Amino acid sequence: YKGKRVRVVFDGIYKNSRIWCNSYHIGKRPYGYTQISYDITDFVQFGAIDNEITVRVCHTDLADSRWFTGSGIYRKAYLVVEEQVHAVWNGVAFNVSRADEQSAAVCADAEIVNELDERVIGTLTASLKLCGSDEESVVFARVPAAMEAHEKKTFYLNGMIGKPKL
């Protein structure tokens, strides 16, 4: 994964968590019901060396939650590997403004960041895939994209999908 961005994601840690990557403190969260994500690229060691993610939880309050009375990592924890030009974490939103049996008008707002030290030019493609389906993704929009080094920009992609599954 050298040359790419590496992110660690926790879908749930309860509560008052502090997180380290290879002894570098990367963040803390005072509560525990929301997903947290940290870019750990600058702390990861590439090659044959093991990496270590450490999570510390401090739950000194007794029975302070009606939903979860335990402590620790209680949902998925995983790594995400991204290209140097990528969507900002949770930075893509889809909207269907009109739909009938024949077609659907689909919009996507995508916040993209260029982590490179150089300008990039390309094409941004938006597609959808029905969850749990073996069908191919349906491309509904393509736009030309140019971004300066370290720029963050929102792109608006609008298109149509024929015969949507309503």
For the regions a language model picked out, list residue spans one by one.
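Hydrophobic beta-strand core residues of beta-sandwich domains
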Residues: 44-45, 100, 147
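Short, charged beta-turn/beta-strand-edge "cap" motif at the junction between a beta-strand
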Residues: 59-60, 159-162
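A generic structural motif
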Residues: 30-32, 144, 159
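Surface beta-strand/loop "capping" patches
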Residues: 84-117
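Beta-strand-rich binding/interaction modules
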Residues: 21, 104-146, 153-157
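Accessory beta-strand-rich segments of carbohydrate-active enzymes
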Residues: 1-89, 115-116
